[in-house]
Swiss-Prot record:
<dbReference type="GO" id="GO:0034497">
    <property type="term" value="P:protein localization to phagophore assembly site"/>
</dbReference>
<keyword id="KW-0418">Kinase</keyword>
<comment type="function">
    <text>Serine/threonine protein kinase involved in the cytoplasm to vacuole transport (Cvt) and found to be essential in autophagy, where it is required for the formation of autophagosomes. Involved in the clearance of protein aggregates which cannot be efficiently cleared by the proteasome. Required for selective autophagic degradation of the nucleus (nucleophagy) as well as for mitophagy which contributes to regulate mitochondrial quantity and quality by eliminating the mitochondria to a basal level to fulfill cellular energy requirements and preventing excess ROS production.</text>
</comment>
<feature type="compositionally biased region" description="Low complexity">
    <location>
        <begin position="919"/>
        <end position="928"/>
    </location>
</feature>
<dbReference type="GO" id="GO:0120095">
    <property type="term" value="C:vacuole-isolation membrane contact site"/>
</dbReference>
<dbReference type="InterPro" id="IPR008271">
    <property type="entry name" value="Ser/Thr_kinase_AS"/>
</dbReference>
<dbReference type="Pfam" id="PF00069">
    <property type="entry name" value="Pkinase"/>
</dbReference>
<dbReference type="GO" id="GO:0010506">
    <property type="term" value="P:regulation of autophagy"/>
</dbReference>
<comment type="subunit">
    <text>Homodimer. Forms a ternary complex with ATG13 and ATG17.</text>
</comment>
<keyword id="KW-0813">Transport</keyword>
<feature type="domain" description="Protein kinase">
    <location>
        <begin position="22"/>
        <end position="327"/>
    </location>
</feature>
<dbReference type="GO" id="GO:0000422">
    <property type="term" value="P:autophagy of mitochondrion"/>
</dbReference>
<keyword id="KW-0472">Membrane</keyword>
<protein>
    <recommendedName>
        <fullName>Serine/threonine-protein kinase ATG1</fullName>
        <ecNumber>2.7.11.1</ecNumber>
    </recommendedName>
</protein>
<dbReference type="Pfam" id="PF21127">
    <property type="entry name" value="ATG1-like_MIT2"/>
</dbReference>
<feature type="region of interest" description="Disordered">
    <location>
        <begin position="334"/>
        <end position="468"/>
    </location>
</feature>
<keyword id="KW-0963">Cytoplasm</keyword>
Length: 943
């Protein structure tokens, strides 16, 4: 793993923190879901990299990626692939012990190319092969790294593996073998095998490249296609950006982008989002230009152009790429010391005798394309992935060649801070990807010696994935990563089209999309609403990752089809989360990719004049766009207060990561019992049920906001709409501001929807785990469910969820609103914290409005028209059929009472502010008068 400068504020772990046979040192990198530490072996002191992943912060798809990465790395042994030494799983974390790459990654190497001479490990390289001004790396270094990267790609190709995230950040560097040989006392790095640091290609005098991060890798035979969209945006192949099925040639495009960046110092295509990136790729017309300052040969330029073909059919094949002169030929321009020496006759004769003595081995190696492959097959035709396993494992420090890499687990301990652990690594041994496929990727039976480790129920192997398994609701991002299933493409299109609408009709500026900065206030609501997670805030500087679906015209012309697709996606997600489908009336909108930048301010934002919270006495909306914006914001505000209430429950269930308070090792063993005594199982079940129903309520309100936006967009996008005719005569500045406001709201709603859905899944897993740990006589134990209730548990995505009878989000919200309003009234009478009283009153009103909000939005019965009746009908359904008339009247009366108190409070605050301002002005006038008259009290002068 690379050594990066960390921006984390986390204190350095104690020196006695250990993971297995390794001692934790300092933190060298950090992501959204994992931290990377340097470490050393207890006995030898050899350096390693420790990637610590917190299980509680991973959704199902990220866990699949992690376990898939572990399963793949367990079998990969190649000099140019980062090796996995060990894997230690604790109660809350999974720790991957990996090879340590002290020179960092290739992106840092390219960025610091002018300062390489200052590093002892790269001083000789910079002296012998200097970089040209305003250009990339020296061509000798480019060809050297390309040969080593090709060696790793060839190794993966012959194992039917596709990496899917080849980029400079995942290409880690080590000092050259010659440098390590000459500086043995500098840093000893733990080796996974006897030839782990012996390059299979390139020059021994230059740094060694290793391919890392197999979180998106999967088994993909040469005749198969994948359709999961994942990887890093700037290095994605265009067929992935177009949501088309793709094969392993997608890696070739990524190799081409890396090669171009090494040659020029920058990526071939720069864009602020995926839509703009695809547009630039298509506009290039396969014409790849190099600047005049770029000093590379025509051979390298030709290879880049052959790799960067938009059409994968026209792209260079793997066979031609592996045999390209740049790959197979000698490196021109070498200094005399680096020119390969001719092989001695005695050594050549020895190798010849070895080949004659082992004809089978020689034939096997020739059939597998030569010396780049260091793993030797045992069987004539084994499973391609098993073919990766090498006898060289016997040289591993762990001596686990026969059984593969084992994962040590601690003794079973109750957990109160993390969701139930996913299925074991054994069950995940064939799940290398999060891609949705209808047939298992591999049907080849395991070798006999692994039968005990790979045994699983027959149903788990043969059961095909259902539609519910493909529900596109697990969206994750770590740095520049993005994962989007095919089912969610329609949901993405709605928000993407709305986000692009403000750009239409405006002059373009350099082909770039300008982002709008938004200040996010700090909530002080007593509901527990909190600002965005620091991990998300840290990512705010990144580009928005919007995607444009390949069927936008269909969406624009058929809003009914769009809403039905979104409803289906929500139902699929609810089936996977809760064990049964919620009706489309309850949840009517689907999920989009999470936005790193949230333009819609989180509730509440008292510092923003045009916030979500309003007193209901503002002037009537001017036009349709104003009414739509008001309706969307009303529902978004109600959902936000419900979300804030749910967060209070959630943060009791999932507290801060153990590594924040106790270092990477988590809670010390002697304090494990104290940490577990915080919540009883009854309390965990109660909190989980309450948080779950509140999250569902928040989802339903967010879905209604998206419903209104969908109807508004369907009219906006129709060219024959009368609105488009009248909009030409309106005030363009006011109209544009309203459209931008709606767009910001839609993007915020989509981001919040993803966050709520992910947290709901964590809560669901926590609830299932807690229910299973209850005594069998407990009413909430799974064995005590009524027979008619068990019929609801038809979930294919996991164990179904059965909340207790009587748990109601409306009841919880009503009690919370009453409690908040009473507390605010007491503080108001005592004249304490009047601004806080105002926030509490407003929050209580919004929460009661959410209680009155109807869950019966009969979406299929709606008729799309050119008027705003749809939004009015949605906003007018404020009475739930599940509530009695007396209950409705009681809630409405409570809303009126709180509004009355709120009006009086605001008048009082205004009076106090006016009096204070008048008093200040009077004091200032008195000071001015005294100064003019000279009546100023002289200061005493010390004698």
């Amino acid at each position: 793993m690379s050594e990066r400068t960390s921006s984390s504020r986390r204190s350095k772990p104690a020196s006695d923190d250990t993971i297995g046979n390794f001692v934790i040192d300092k933190e060298i990198g950090k992501g959204s879901f994992a931290q990377v530490y340097s470490g050393r072996h207890k006995v030898t002191g050899a350096l390693v990299a420790i990637k610590s992943v917190e299980l509680a912060r991973l959704n199902t798809k990220l866990k699949d990626n992690l376990y898939g990465e572990i399963e793949i790395l367990k079998r990969l042994r190649h000099p140019h692939i980062v090796a996995l030494h060990d894997c230690v799983e604790s109660r809350t974390h999974i720790n991957l012990i990996m090879e340590y790459c002290e020179l960092g990654d290739l992106s840092l190497f390219i960025k610091k190319r002018d300062k390489l001479i200052t590093n002892p490990g790269t001083h000789e390289l910079a002296r012998k092969y200097p970089v040209a001004p305003n250009s990339g790396l020296n061509e000798v270094v480019i060809r050297h790294f390309l040969k080593q990267l090709t060696s790793a790609i060839r190794f993966l190709r012959e194992a039917n593996l596709i990496h899917r995230d080849v980029k400079p950040q995942n290409l880690l560097l080590l000092p050259s073998p010659q440098y390590r040989e000459a500086n043995k006392m500098h840093k000893q790095i733990l080796s996974a095998s006897h030839d782990s640091f012996t390059p299979a290609a390139g020059l021994p005098s230059l740094p060694m490249l290793k391919l890392a991060d197999f979180g998106f890798a999967r088994v993909l035979p040469s005749t198969s296609l994948a359709e999961t969209l994942c990887g890093s945006p700037l290095y994605m192949a265009p067929e992935i950006l177009r949501y088309e099925k793709y094969d392993a040639k997608a890696d070739l495009w990524s190799v081409g982008t890396v090669l171009y960046e090494m040659a020029t110092g920058r990526p071939p295509f720069r864009a602020v989002n995926h839509v703009d990136l695809l547009r630039k790729i298509e506009a290039s017309g396969d014409v790849i230009r190099f600047s005049r300052e770029c000093v590379v040969s025509s051979e390298v330029k030709g290879l880049v152009r052959a790799l960067l073909k938009r059409n994968p059919v026209e792209r260079i094949s793997f066979e031609d790429f592996f045999h390209h002169p740049v790959i197979t030929g000698p490196i021109p321009g070498l200094v005399e010391d680096d020119i390969p020496k001719p092989e001695k006759p005695v050594l050549a004769e020895t190798k010849s005798r070895i080949r004659r003595a082992n004809p089978e081995l020689s034939h096997t190696r020739r059939s597998r394309a030569g010396p780049h492959l260091l793993a030797t097959p045992i069987e004539p035709k084994p499973n391609p992935l098993e073919q990766v396993a090498s006898p060289r494992l016997s040289y591993s420090p762990r001596q686990e060649a026969d059984e593969g890499l084992g994962i040590r687990r601690p003794l079973a301990q109750p957990s109160t801070s993390a969701p139930v652990r996913p299925i074991s690594y054994v069950d995940r041994s064939r799940r290398y990807s999060n891609a949705s496929t209808k047939v298992p990727a591999r049907d080849t039976p395991p070798p006999p010696h692994e039968g005990s480790n790979r045994s699983r129920p027959k149903s788990a192997v043969s059961r095909p994935l259902t539609d519910e398994d493909k529900a596109a609701q697990d969206v994750a991002f770590e740095r520049d990563y993005i994962i989007i299933d095919k089912t969610a493409v329609e949901v993405n299109a709605l928000a993407d089209q709305i986000s692009l609408y403000p750009q239409q009709g405006q002059p373009k500026s350099g082909g770039q999309i300008v982002r709008r900065a938004t200040q996010q206030g700090h909530p002080t609501s007593t509901t527990g609403a909190v600002p965005s997670h620091p991990g998300r805030n840290a990512q705010g500087g990144r580009n928005d990752h919007y995607r444009k679906a390949s069927h936008d015209k269909t969406l624009s012309g058929s809003p009914g089809a769009t809403t039905s697709v979104i409803s289906k996606a929500i139902q699929d997600a609810s089936l996977r989360l809760f064990g049964f489908k919620y009706s489309p009336q309850m949840l009517s909108k689907g999920q989009s990719p999470p936005q790193i930048y949230s333009p819609f301010p989180a509730y509440p934002t008292p510092s923003t004049p045009a916030g979500l919270i309003m007193d209901g006495k503002q002037s009537a909306p001017v036009d349709e766009d104003s009414r739509v914006a008001q309706c969307i914001e009303d529902y978004a505000t109600r959902s936000d207060v419900v979300y804030g209430f749910a967060e209070v429950k959630y943060k009791q269930l999932v507290p801060l990561a153990p590594s924040v308070e106790h270092g990477l090792g988590g809670v010390p063993t002697d304090r494990m019992g104290e940490e577990e005594e915080g919540l009883t199982m009854d309390a965990v079940v109660s909190l989980s049920e309450e948080a779950l129903v509140l999250y569902v309520k928040a989802l339903s309100l967010l879905a209604k906001s998206m419903d209104i936006a969908s109807l508004w967009w369907s009219r906006k996008s129709r060219p024959e709409s009368s609105n488009n005719v009248h909009s030409a005569t309106r005030d363009s500045v006011n109209t544009q501001a309203l459209v931008l406001k709606i767009n910001a709201a839609v993007q915020w709603i989509r981001s919040r929807f993803n966050e709520v859905l992910e947290k709901a899944e964590i809560v669901r897993l926590r609830l299932v785990e807690a229910q299973n740990q209850l005594p069998e006589e407990h009413p909430s134990h799974p064995s005590n469910r009524p027979p008619e209730t068990s019929a609801l548990g038809g979930s294919s995505g996991g164990q179904a969820t059965f909340p207790s009878v009587g748990i109601s989000a409306e009841k919880l919200m009503y009690d919370r609103a009453v409690e908040m309003s009473r507390t605010a009234a007491i503080n108001e009478i005592a004249s304490e914290d009047l601004p806080g009283c105002e926030i509490s009153y407003v929050t209580a009103v919004r929460m009661l409005e959410a209680v009155l909000d109807s869950d019966d939005d009969h979406l299929p019965k709606r008729r799309v028209s050119t008027s705003s009746k749809e939004e009015q009908s949605v906003a007018a359904q404020d009475a739930s059929d599940d509530m009695s008339s007396d209950d409705k009247q009681a809630v409405q009366k409570m809303v009126q009472m709180i509004n009355t108190r709120l009006t009086y409070l605001r008048k009082r605050m205004h009076t106090i502010a006016a009096a204070s301002k008048a008093q200040q002005q009077q004091q200032q006038q008195q000071v001015v008068v005294r100064r003019r008259s000279g009546d100023v009290t002289p200061r005493s002068v010390p004698t």
